[in-house]
Each structure stands twice: as structure tokens, then as C-alpha cells.
Amino acid sequence: MTVGVLSLQGSFYEHLFILSRLNTDHIQVKTSEDLSRVTRLIIPGGESTAMLALTQKSGLFDLVRDRIMSGMPVYGTCAGMIMLSTFVEDFPNQKTLSCLDIAVRRNAFGRQINSFESEVSFLNSKITVPFIRAPKITQIGEGVDVLSRLESGDIVAVRQGNVMATAFHPELTGGAAVHEYFLHLGLE
């Protein structure tokens, strides 16, 4: 197994660090050749419109979507979740990969100054994770499993088949529970 981390923009170094700690083969994905070498992909947090522009300019956008639709496991954090969604409520014309049947609203938990940490349940354990200009999942389709919610009831982690996403940034905590789950996605 080789995990790729889309490394065009955003918090990709932090994901690479977690994968190193887990002794997992991993590479940065910046080109189509890089993408062809991976069996899983992480799309990091960052700025979703910048990430969209860079994936289109690099020629990776359609290739990433094709690989996901062919069954490659993928995990998107924050902006990565926006990229994977089917609809962005506050930017209805924003192009997405449309691989995860959810609607999202960008920056729904507030601006940078409103960033916060919260304890969430994730697979029978409690983890404390940061929400930084985080998107909110406003609607989920059939076949989308909820993995985690805030106390308010807001859904903050989901999975649909080979695709998972979180509104939060587990890569910034040093904990590896979410990444470990992703590494087993599709193997169960």
C-alpha cells in the first residue's frame, strides 16, 4: 500500500508526518505520474478554490476523480471534504469531484478567528480535534454513513464506500486514530 497526499496546497506536510509515524509508505502527489503510484489518496485541508484551480491546472482533477470512481480509497479533510462533495451551498457553481453524496457550506463554523477545538466521538473513542474555517455538512445522501458528530448534532465525519471526509483537521493533533481508520478503509 502506498498512500499519496495531494501536495499542491494546504496542510499536506502534517498528513505526511502522521503517515511517517504510522510507518506507512507514502508520497507527495503533484503530478499524474505520482498519482499512478498510489493506492490511496488524502486530500488535505487548505483553501478549496485554490486547490480546485491547482488540480485543474496540473491536470490532476479528472484523474483523481477517475481513480476515486474506480474504487481508490480517498480521505478529505476540511477543504478536501469540500472538494469531494457533490454540492457547495454557498458557492453553487463551484466545481467539485462529486464523489461523496453530501452538500456542504464553506466556513460554516466561522472565520479563522472563530477556530476552535472540540472533543468528538470517533469509532468508540473520544478525540479532540481542531475546526479551522471548517465546512458544515448540511445534507447527506443515501449510503453515506455518519462517523462523528459534534454535541450540537452537526455531522463532522462521514464515509460512503471508499470515500471518507472530516470537517476537522486530525493531522494537526498528533493523534493517528482517523488516519488508522482510513488505512483500513476497504479492507474490512
UniProtKB/Swiss-Prot annotation:
Family the UniProt entry places it in: Belongs to the glutaminase PdxT/SNO family.
Enzyme Commission designation: 4.3.3.6, 3.5.1.2
UniProt cross-references to Gene3D superfamilies, sorted A to Z: 3.40.50.880
Superkingdom of origin: Bacteria
HAMAP family (alphabetical): PdxT
Pathway entry: Cofactor biosynthesis; pyridoxal 5'-phosphate biosynthesis
Reaction catalyzed: aldehydo-D-ribose 5-phosphate + D-glyceraldehyde 3-phosphate + L-glutamine = pyridoxal 5'-phosphate + L-glutamate + phosphate + 3 H2O + H(+); L-glutamine + H2O = L-glutamate + NH4(+)
Membrane-crossing residue ranges in chain numbering: none
GO biological process: glutamine catabolic process; pyridoxal phosphate biosynthetic process; pyridoxine metabolic process
UniProt-recorded name of the protein: Pyridoxal 5'-phosphate synthase subunit PdxT
Transmembrane helix among keywords: no
InterPro entries, alphabetized: Class_I_gatase-like, PdxT/SNO, PdxT/SNO_CS
Quaternary structure note: In the presence of PdxS, forms a dodecamer of heterodimers. Only shows activity in the heterodimer.
Gene symbol of the encoding locus: pdxT
Molecular function terms from GO: glutaminase activity; pyridoxal 5'-phosphate synthase (glutamine hydrolysing) activity
CC terms in the record's Gene Ontology section: cytosol; glutaminase complex
SUPFAM superfamilies named among the record's database cross-references: Class I glutamine amidotransferase-like
Active site: 78 (nucleophile), 169 (charge relay system), 171 (charge relay system)
Binding locations of L-glutamine: 46-48, 106, 132-133
Keywords: Glutamine amidotransferase, Hydrolase, Lyase, Pyridoxal phosphate
UniProt signal peptide: none
Classification lineage: Bacteria, Bacillati, Actinomycetota, Actinomycetes, Micrococcales
Species of provenance: Tropheryma whipplei (strain Twist)
Function in brief: Catalyzes the hydrolysis of glutamine to glutamate and ammonia as part of the biosynthesis of pyridoxal 5'-phosphate. The resulting ammonia molecule is channeled to the active site of PdxS.
